[in-house]
Amino acid sequence: MTGEESGEVVEPRAADSPTAAGILLQFAAQAFCRVRDASFIHVNLDSVAHNIQVLKSLSGPNTGIMGVVKGGAYGSGMMKVVEVLVEEGVKELSVAKVGEAVYLRKRGINHPITVLGNLSTFELPDVMQYNLIPSLSWTTPLTSVPRDTLVYPDGSPLRVAINIDTGMSRYGVQPCDLRAMVHTLDDLGVSINSMYTHLQGSITEKKKNQKQIDIFLEATEPYKERPLTRHLAATTGCVQDLGTHLDFIRPGGAITGLSSGADRESAQQFANCGFRPAFSVVVRPTYFKLLPAGRFIGYDATYETRGDEWIANFTTGWSDGLSRRLSNGVGAVKRVKTGELCPIVGRVSMDSITVRLPEAPGEDDVFQVITDDFDDVTSAVGMARNLGAAVYEMPGNWSTRLARVYSRNGKIVHVCNALEYEC
C-alpha cells in the first residue's frame, strides 16, 4: 500500500550497508563539483557490463545479442551505453526511430542497426545512406519508389526485418500474409535480413507468450534455410527463457537493469536473474529549515506540519522527470548515509520538491530520488508499482536538464552536461 492509499507519508527505514554508502558519498562529492549542480543522474556502466554477462548466461551458446538502445537507452544515454555493449561483444543494435540510428552512425557506430519502428517511404533516403535495416509490416513503402533506389551506397540491396504479428496486434504482417510479402520482396530484389515478433505477455504470463512463439516458429519454418536470422526474446523472453535459443535475443530494459514488469512477482524473477539497475538520481538539499506545527507547505497547501519538522528543498521536479503523482508522501528520497526513507511532503513542483527529514542534514549528506536497486519505494520498479506506471517510464521520462554522470570502477569516466541532447 502506498502513502496515497493509506493517507500516511512514508516513514524512515533502517540503514543500508555503510560501505556502499561511503563509496557513494565519496563519488557524489566529486560529481557535484563536476556538474556544478545539486542534482544529477548517475549511470553505473559497470552494471551495464554486468547485465550483458547475465544476458549471455540466459541465452544459448550460439545466440547473439541485439542490444535495444531506443529512447536514449531507456533514459541512461544511448552513446555511452552503446560503447559498453560494443566492448562486451554485442554484435547488433536496434532502435525505434531512424533518427536514433543516424545519430549512432554519425558517431562512428558501424554495427548492423535494425530500426524497429515500421518504415515510412520518406525515411528511405536516410535508411539507404546510413546502411540501416528497416522493419516492415507491409511492402507499401517499397513498392511506391523506383527499384533502383533500394540499393545501399556500396551497391548491395536493401536489407529489411519483417515484423510478424503473432498476438501483439500492433505492427506486423499477419502470418497468413507472410508468404505473399516474401514473394514481393524477392521480386523487388530486397534482401530479408531477419524475421521477428514481439511478445505481449508479462514476465508472469509465460503460457501466453509460449503461444506466440509457437505461431512465430510455424510461420517462419519455411524460411529457416534462407540466410536470415530470427529473434523474439526481449527482456521478458530472456527472463522466461522463451526464444533464447534463436539467432538473437533482443533485450532493452534489461541492459540497464530495468524489469519489464512492475508487479512483485515479475520484479522478483527479474532480480533473481542477477540484473543490476544502472540508473539513479542523486541530489543534495539546497535549503532546509525547522518549521513549527501548523505550517502548510507548497502549492495548494496540501501538507501541514504536525510538530517541529525539518523540511529540506531539493532542486528537481516534474520538469526533470519526477512524477507529480509522488507528491504528499506517495514518494520519498533515500538518505544515503543512513538508508532512511524521507517522505516527499507537499507537491512535486516544476523545479523542486520538499522533503521531511528526521534531523538537520549534514554538509556531506547525499540523497537519492531514484535508487539503483529494487526498493519498494525509491527504485524505478518500486515507483512504477506504486504509480501504476511502466518501469521504463521512471528513468525514460528524465530530461536532459540534469547532467548524466557515468562511472566505471567507482570513478567518473564521462559527464554529459545538462541540456546536451544525448550522451
Describe each model-derived feature in a short phrase:
Residues R13, I23, F27, C33-V35, ...:
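Active-site-proximal beta-alpha core segment in soluble small-molecule metabolic enzymes
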Residues G3-L45, A49, S57, E100, ...:
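Active-site anion/phosphate-binding pocket segments in diverse small-molecule metabolic enzymes
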